[in-house]
């Protein structure tokens, strides 16, 4: 597929947006939700390393993105479930993410891709379910946005009629989902106080 004009700018902007949203969410949730703050911080650090390396496909940058996905997103879900009293699901999600992070070296590139997309979808669906039952509209939007990013990443780009590269759209959706999760955690905290 031929590169789109302005593709590098699009990629840089999507990385900046995701990094800024994740860093803001990490800083503002650090007092009340340390697990979620760590997940947001992992996502911000992964995007920062991608930007610092010039948006390349360096192995270390890809490994950072892998860890941010399989540990960072389950950390977000962990806090979301834990606050609502679903400790077993919280522990299961986080434990599964830790096992995947350790097993990442034993998976091929395709295996890591599929496992990462599965983590995104599982986190999105479980938070969406909790958000529906607790009527947390921000959590619902976050689940939908993260689920859309996970589903879009599975589609073949040449079949899509997109103005931007698929990876950039996924990052924009992830940034929107992260912002919504940040607001959902804030809403949850206000409900419990």
UniProtKB/Swiss-Prot annotation:
The keyword Signal applies. It comes from the Eukaryota. Its main location: membrane. Keywords: Membrane, Signal, Transmembrane, Transmembrane helix. Residues 1-32 form the signal peptide. It is a multi-pass membrane protein. One of its GO terms (cellular component) is membrane. Disulfide bonds: none annotated. The keyword rRNA-binding does not apply. It is found in: Membrane. The chain crosses the membrane at residues 35-55, 63-83, 89-109, 114-134. This is Transmembrane protein 276.
